[in-house]
């Protein structure tokens, strides 16, 4: 059986922004978007093939990914086997979501983005990172899980709303899903993942300048490599890549000791971490989320093989001290997605919230992981008490004293 793939507020408190509770059956009308063909590019079309009437947020889903900048949260892909929630017979990609959404922070509104080009079809447990104005997507699986995996890199420029497949050379990773990915020093690193049947401990690197893949061969003996895994997360400090959790269909790995890949020595190292007093260490988990702010890494939610977790932990990459934060997810989830803004606000969307009923949620929550700057506090209050700000023309915004950077966040 293939491995599953879908699966002014107070600080350190989750705030719900949008979304319907798991299992909501609100009827939605779906409208196909016409396909566009040209002689020069016969495959050109709008891949977000359905626009929804009366729905202001993405349907409940799991196995999707998200990234954030100062202005938007971008949510791509996902999976929901619930026939009605996924659009029924009018959704050609059921039970997957071949679509890209953005949540605009300034207005609190969701927008399904119409895009041109070649959107990937591997829509569950892919990897997604933000590089400038580009979304980079790698891997993932279609349906059935493990039978239609990907190993190409797709790029979507969010300004021009166009997808393209990156032409790469060299030794690409296998067709996998559930891998972890990060951009470090101009290289795209991919670690682990699964074919659906075989789990990986491979580490690959793509040079984003030359577009050449290589498989890194660490100097360790095979017995010293990390255990094969999927649905883990990675963090980095510029000198090492740190692997956090993950597992297989039958296990979840501990967070008491962390595997770290050393760039300089080309070796894997085992780094013990420090517990949070009597609270100890975070539970072993897979299918959790992870965001990083400088040298602090935050993990949230996940699944330990028995229960869905809703806790929030912080790891300092200089001291390797774990700290349990005094916040719990309002809807404990796994196979959810999370992203953090440059200002330090984390957004969490979707995920599986009930194992027995196989229910997913479409809820969106936010939580500040750092003390917001005075600018951010003033900005949030300005938007709260002057919501029509987004409707003003640029010259009026400039007259009000807004900087060009803040004006860009209104678009």
UniProtKB/Swiss-Prot annotation:
It comes from the Eukaryota. Pathway: Protein modification; protein ubiquitination. GO terms for biological process: positive regulation of stress-activated MAPK cascade; protein ubiquitination; rescue of stalled ribosome. This is Kelch domain-containing protein 10. Substrate-recognition component of a Cul2-RING (CRL2) E3 ubiquitin-protein ligase complex of the DesCEND (destruction via C-end degrons) pathway, which recognizes a C-degron located at the extreme C terminus of target proteins, leading to their ubiquitination and degradation. The C-degron recognized by the DesCEND pathway is usually a motif of less than ten residues and can be present in full-length proteins, truncated proteins or proteolytically cleaved forms. Belongs to the KLHDC10 family. Disulfide bonds: none annotated. Component of a CRL2 E3 ubiquitin-protein ligase complex, also named ECS (Elongin BC-CUL2/5-SOCS-box protein) complex, composed of CUL2, Elongin BC (ELOB and ELOC), RBX1 and substrate-specific adapter KLHDC10. Gene3D superfamilies: Kelch-type beta propeller. InterPro entries: Kelch-typ_b-propeller, Kelch_1, KLHDC10. Kelch repeats lie at residues 72-133, 135-186, 187-239, 240-288, 296-342, 345-388.
């Amino acid at each position: 059986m293939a491995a599953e793939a879908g699966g002014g507020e107070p600080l350190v408190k989750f705030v719900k922004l949008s979304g319907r509770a798991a299992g909501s059956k609100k009827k939605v009308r779906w409208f196909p978007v016409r396909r566009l063909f040209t002689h020069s590019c016969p495959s050109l079309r709008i891949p977000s093939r359905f626009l929804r009437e009366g729905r202001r947020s993405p349907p409940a889903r799991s196995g999707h990914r998200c990234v954030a900048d100062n202005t938007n949260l971008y949510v791509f892909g996902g999976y929901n086997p619930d026939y009605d929630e996924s659009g029924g017979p009018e959704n050609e990609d059921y039970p997957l979501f071949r679509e890209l959404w953005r949540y605009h922070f300034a207005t609190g509104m969701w927008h399904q983005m119409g895009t041109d080009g070649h959107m990937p079809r591997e829509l569950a447990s892919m990897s997604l990172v933000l590089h400038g104005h580009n979304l980079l997507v790698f891997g993932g699986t279609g349906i059935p899980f493990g039978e239609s995996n990907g190993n190409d890199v797709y790029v979507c420029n969010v300004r021009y709303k166009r997808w393209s497949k990156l032409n790469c050379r060299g030794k690409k990773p296998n067709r996998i899903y559930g891998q972890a990915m990060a951009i470090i020093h101009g290289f795209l690193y991919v670690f682990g993942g699964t074919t659906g049947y075989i789990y990986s401990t491979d580490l690959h690197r793509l040079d984003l300048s030359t577009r050449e893949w290589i498989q890194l061969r660490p100097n360790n003996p095979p017995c010293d490599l990390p255990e094969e895994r999927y649905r883990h997360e990675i963090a980095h400090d510029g000198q090492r890549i740190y692997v956090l959790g993950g597992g297989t269909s039958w296990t979840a790995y501990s967070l008491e000791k962390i595997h770290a890949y050393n760039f300089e020595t080309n070796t894997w190292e085992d780094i013990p971490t420090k517990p949070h007093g009597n609270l100890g260490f975070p539970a072993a988990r897979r299918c959790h989320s992870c965001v990083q702010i400088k040298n602090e890494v935050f993990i949230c939610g996940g699944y330990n093989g028995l229960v869905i977790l809703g806790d929030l932990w912080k790891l300092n990459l200089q001291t390797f001290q774990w700290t349990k934060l005094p916040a719990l997810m309002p809807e404990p989830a796994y196979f959810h997605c999370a992203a953090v803004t440059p200002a330090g606000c984390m957004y969490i969307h979707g995920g599986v919230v009930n194992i027995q009923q196989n229910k997913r949620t479409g809820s969106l929550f936010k939580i500040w992981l750092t003390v917001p700057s005075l600018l951010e506090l003033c900005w949030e209050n300005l938007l709260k008490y002057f919501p029509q700000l987004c409707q003003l023309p640029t010259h009026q915004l400039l007259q009000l004293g807004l900087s060009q950077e803040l004006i860009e966040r209104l678009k």
